[in-house]
């Protein structure tokens, strides 16, 4: 898992933050209210209604679960929810809450209607999760005082609050935890026009000169992810300041992204390495995940968690009962002729591999 996180941090088109410096940069560009939030129209519309209703009743917003791929704005929405409700936000993450006391300390310091944001909520330990259940339902927690035979349970009342949980792996949440969220929202990948709007907004905040075609060129290579779009914008801005008098046009963006090995559909060297291995070493597939990992010198987890999701989502890769298979789009992308349909049908005949 450490190697997977390391690779994700090193890729310019990775959807996870690459450093604490980048997190500071993200905060500077983060929209502060729902009206400024681009994309996710369905989720945004729902939150507008639920937040306004809660404010009219002077109640905390129902607990909110946000899930979807990294980099799509879950943390941003948590901050916006707190700001729209006019309350404080306390932020933590699942791995940080190692003991029940860690969570109890956070909960007992919340003021009325505050928002507690737990990122990576699927990584909460079972003992911490058990403490959370009564807090979510009854605004109470039970803590143990003392040790051994003298230990006793003390019930503490909490201020009403809203939990906003964020996860990239909703399937890893336990059913009891998932059932305690009154509002569940999935964030989807953005289209190029939405990302171009985000790029133009970010460029304005950075005092970068960009024309609509330059913003669209960056957007098309951003893998449907605002975090990647903003990261690419920073690098293209650097290139433009040195090579193009600070003017970001489509041609300048294309040259900058080519220098970074980000191709017109957002693939980098690792994406191309994986797809080319399937095409050339395994005749387009099917190939089992372990064989593929050995062929490209990467860990299985890295392929499944870092490389594959976008390739599958965009239709360049398929998981079949017999392994990974390159699609017609992949052959076209690399300028190759696809095998005839008769050969492809054989991929699905008998389950084998992983």
Swiss-Prot record:
UniProt key word Cytoplasm: yes
This enzyme's EC code(s): 3.6.4.-
Stretches the record annotates as Head domain (RuvB-H): 264-354
Gene Ontology BP terms: DNA recombination; DNA repair
Protein residues bound to ATP: 29-30, 71, 74-76, 137-139, 180, 190, 227
Catalysed reaction, written as an equation: ATP + H2O = ADP + phosphate + H(+)
GO cellular component entries: cytoplasm; Holliday junction resolvase complex
Keywords: ATP-binding, Cytoplasm, DNA damage, DNA recombination, DNA repair, DNA-binding, Hydrolase, Nucleotide-binding
Compartments it resides in: Cytoplasm
Chief location of this protein within or outside the cell: cytoplasm
Small ATPAse domain (RuvB-S), as annotated region: 191-261
Residues binding Mg(2+): 75
Entries under Pfam families matching the protein: AAA_lid_4, RuvB_C, RuvB_N
Enzyme class: hydrolase
Residue positions binding DNA: 300, 319, 324
Domain of life from the UniProt record: Bacteria
Subunit structure: Homohexamer. Forms an RuvA(8)-RuvB(12)-Holliday junction (HJ) complex. HJ DNA is sandwiched between 2 RuvA tetramers; dsDNA enters through RuvA and exits via RuvB. An RuvB hexamer assembles on each DNA strand where it exits the tetramer. Each RuvB hexamer is contacted by two RuvA subunits (via domain III) on 2 adjacent RuvB subunits; this complex drives branch migration. In the full resolvosome a probable DNA-RuvA(4)-RuvB(12)-RuvC(2) complex forms which resolves the HJ.
Function description: The RuvA-RuvB-RuvC complex processes Holliday junction (HJ) DNA during genetic recombination and DNA repair, while the RuvA-RuvB complex plays an important role in the rescue of blocked DNA replication forks via replication fork reversal (RFR). RuvA specifically binds to HJ cruciform DNA, conferring on it an open structure. The RuvB hexamer acts as an ATP-dependent pump, pulling dsDNA into and through the RuvAB complex. RuvB forms 2 homohexamers on either side of HJ DNA bound by 1 or 2 RuvA tetramers; 4 subunits per hexamer contact DNA at a time.
Family classification: Belongs to the RuvB family.
Entry-linked HAMAP family: DNA_HJ_migration_RuvB (MF_00016)
Protein name as annotated: Holliday junction branch migration complex subunit RuvB
Species, as recorded: Burkholderia ambifaria (strain MC40-6)
């Amino acid at each position: 898992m450490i190697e997977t996180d390391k690779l994700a941090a090193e890729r310019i088109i990775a959807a996870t933050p690459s450093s604490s410096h980048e997190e500071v940069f993200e905060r500077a560009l983060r929209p502060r209210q729902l009206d400024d939030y681009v994309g996710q129209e369905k989720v945004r519309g729902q939150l507008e209604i639920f937040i306004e209703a809660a404010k009219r009743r002077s109640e905390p917003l129902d607990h909110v679960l946000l899930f979807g791929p990294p980099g799509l704005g879950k943390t941003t929405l948590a901050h916006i929810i707190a700001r729209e409700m006019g309350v404080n936000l306390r932020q933590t993450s699942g791995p940080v809450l190692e003991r029940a006391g860690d969570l109890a300390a956070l909960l007992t310091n919340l003021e009325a209607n505050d928002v507690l944001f737990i990122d990576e909520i699927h990584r909460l330990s079972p003992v911490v999760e058990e403490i959370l259940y009564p807090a979510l339902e009854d605004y109470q927690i039970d803590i143990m005082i003392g040790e051994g035979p003298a230990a006793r349970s003390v019930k503490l009342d909490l201020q009403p609050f809203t939990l906003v949980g964020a996860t990239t792996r909703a399937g890893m949440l336990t059913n009891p935890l998932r059932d305690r969220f009154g509002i569940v929202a999935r964030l989807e990948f953005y289209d190029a026009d939405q990302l171009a709007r985000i790029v133009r907004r970010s460029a304005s905040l950075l005092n970068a000169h960009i024309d609509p075609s330059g913003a669209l060129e960056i957007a098309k290579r951003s893998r449907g992810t605002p975090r990647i779009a903003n990261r690419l914008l920073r690098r293209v801005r650097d290139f433009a300041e040195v090579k193009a008098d600070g003017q970001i046009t489509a041609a300048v963006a294309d040259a900058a992204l080519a220098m970074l090995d980000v191709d017109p559909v957002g693939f980098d060297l690792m994406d191309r390495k994986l797809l080319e291995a399937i095409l050339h070493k395994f005749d387009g597939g099917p190939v089992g995940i372990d064989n593929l990992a050995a062929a490209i010198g990467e860990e299985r987890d890295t392929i499944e968690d870092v490389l594959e999701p976008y390739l599958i989502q965009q239709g360049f890769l398929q998981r079949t009962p017999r392994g990974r298979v390159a699609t017609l789009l992949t052959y076209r992308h690399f300028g190759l002729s696809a095998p005839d349909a008769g050969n492809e049908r054989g991929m699905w005949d008998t389950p084998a591999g992983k």
